[in-house]
Regions:
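Alpha-helical multipass membrane-protein architecture
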Residues: 1-567
Length: 567
């Protein structure tokens, strides 16, 4: 049982007015996110935007604490990644001519199953990633800094909102007006998207994550793009298309191997400890260990029963059969771990990649109609998208001192609302525009879903996937960040290069600060205080740049939806 102070804390942070504001905002943000993901082939995190809006409306209604605003924005932003999970997968089936075989109920069950699995998984992995590993989660940190600056005002507020304004204006010039290009320094290299992405957000991600982790990310990008694609084709080992398939397979294998290794090394021992009753007093440290019931043992039972129930629902309602349903349910827990690690270190949640991985695994063991494979990818993508959002929110809560149980309940509310809204918006769009409007060079590019449609035929290179899978497990046990390397191998080179440049700025920033402090003749205490203030300034400005671009991305989505409705 949780102690009274924790219950009081939860009641003070999860309020009726916060739930109402959060749900209304969730409906709007979820709808715009579905449209954005389909129209632009991308989906910016709405977390910072939701944090600012939540605090604004709560203050209009009277006094509001940062923790109440944090829980409210958790509800408000939850549906965005649910919408992204659907939009990044299901339209692939429309492109292949299966639109008439997918109903609103099918999409809702896909979204709901993914939402519940994501919630159950994050209750299990919260402590590992937020407390033990204490990953950066740059987007969650940005939300926390935004709330603090909004509350405190003063110099920190000016730095944050000034940098947000700069990034926001720049994003409008780039995305709405086309005054500045999206890509810089592009080179025509067959099979490699060599460019610098003209994005304050991605530069800030590199700055916030730091040089060392991003260096591994960039090393993976160099290996995949120049080692395999450029080097392999130059040596005559394979053509460009084959090399690209090898790179995708290797990247997926590395990330999958990492996810399995985390389960084997870190998560299963925790579960085994619960089963053996090693956590004798479930009332201690409940905010860090137990999010659902307040009891570690009861939580384990709830998670197990919940997962079993979802497997049954998937098997019956979506007609996948028992074996595929069990595979999807179990492996979704692995991919949510991968998602949490990726978001924690890079700020990027490649949810459709994880959906692809499990879809291809199921396809290798079961004979299913192609349209059913999209359901599998959708469930996993929704779960991973929601998990990334939850873990970012937990990070903001850790910074601000918010009760994680209140956040988890808020996420459940927002996730379920988001599942309803996202499915409805998807049906509305395909009904209004027709399935032929979705795909490359169409009104709705749905880039990620197009990739899923292409991959339905199978893993491009099974040997390279298997090799990457084994390497991912071994590398994690050796302390090598396989997830970062795998991301670098898989993601477009321009994203990795831009993030690396941001991390180089952070490296130079730290070295300049160290040199300045060393030559200033300060005492150890003065040097430590000045260095802390300097690091906070860098964090605030980088968070502002990240938040400014994400806020403008959401606002532009609102404008796009409005113009479409009017026109």
């Amino acid at each position: 049982m949780s102690n009274p102070s924790n219950r009081a804390s939860m009641r003070g942070q999860l309020t009726l007015r916060g739930v109402v504001i959060g749900v209304l905002g969730c409906v709007i943000i979820t709808a715009s996110s579905a449209y954005t993901a389909l129209k632009m082939g991308a989906l910016p995190w709405p977390i910072v935007f939701a944090a600012v809006i939540s605090l604004f409306f709560l203050k209009l209604m009277g006094n509001a604490s940062l923790n109440e605003a944090n829980v409210t924005h958790t509800i408000m932003s939850a549906g965005a990644m649910v919408a992204g999970g659907l939009a990044f997968t299901i339209p692939g089936a429309w492109m292949l001519g299966y639109a008439d075989q997918i109903s609103w109920l099918d999409m809702f069950i896909v979204a709901l199953a993914g939402t519940i699995l994501g919630l159950l998984a994050t209750a299990l992995i919260h402590r590992h990633f937020i407390v033990d590993a204490a990953l950066e989660f740059p987007t969650g940190n940005a939300a926390a800094q935004t709330l603090r600056a909004t509350e405190a005002g003063g110099k920190t507020g000016k730095q944050l909102f000034g940098s947000m304004a700069i990034a926001g204006i720049y994003s409008v010039l780039r995305d709405a007006l086309g005054v500045v290009p999206s890509m810089l320094c592009t080179l025509n290299i067959p099979g490699v998207t060599f460019a610098i992405y003209n994005s304050p957000m991605l530069l800030s991600v590199g700055f916030l994550v730091g040089f060392a982790p991003v260096a591994f990310w960039f090393a993976g990008a160099l290996l995949g793009n120049f080692g395999i694609i450029v080097g392999g084709t130059a040596a005559g080992l394979f053509d460009v298309m084959t090399a690209q398939g090898i790179v995708k397979s290797l990247g997926m294998g590395l990330m999958m191997g990492f996810g399995v290794a985390v389960v084997l090394k870190d998560i299963l021992p925790q579960v085994a400890g619960i089963v053996r009753g090693l956590a004798a007093d479930s009332s201690t440290d409940t905010d860090e260990q137990s999010l659902i019931s307040g009891s570690l043992k009861l939580d384990a039972g709830i998670i197990g029963l919940g997962a079993a129930a979802i497997a049954v629902i998937i098997a019956i309602v979506l007609d996948l059969g028992p074996v595929p349903a069990v595979i999807v349910t179990l492996f979704t827990f692995v991919t949510t771990i991968m998602s949490a690690q990726s978001c924690g270190q890079t700020g990027i949640d490649p949810m459709e990649i994880f959906g692809l991985i499990i879809m291809l695994i199921v396809a290798a063991f079961a004979q299913l109609a192609q349209v059913k494979l999209f359901f599998i990818a959708g469930i996993v993508a929704v779960a991973c998208g929601l998990a990334g959002d939850v873990m970012n929110d937990f990070k903001a809560g850790a910074v601000l001192g918010t009760n994680p149980r209140a956040q988890w309940v808020g996420q459940a509310i927002g996730g379920i609302v988001g599942a309803l809204v996202a499915a409805a918006v998807m049906v509305a769009l395909v009904t209004a525009y027709g399935p032929d409007a979705f795909g490359p060079d169409k009104s709705f590019v749905a880039a990620q879903a197009s990739v899923v449609a292409t991959m339905v035929s199978g893993i491009p290179s099974v040997p390279w996937f298997a090799g990457g899978f084994i390497a991912g497990i071994v590398m994690y046990w050796l302390g090598i960040p396989a997830m970062m390397i795998g991301l670098g191998v898989y993601l477009p080179f321009y994203m990795s290069l831009t993030a690396f440049l941001g991390s180089c700025v952070k490296l130079a920033y730290d070295k300049w600060a160290a040199h300045r402090d060393a030559t200033a003749g300060l005492s150890d205490e003065e040097r430590a205080a000045k260095d802390a203030a300097f690091q906070e300034q860098g964090l605030v400005v980088a968070s502002g740049l990240l938040g400014g671009e994400s806020i403008v991305g959401v606002i532009l989505a609102f404008v796009s939806v409005g113009l479409s409705l009017l026109g």
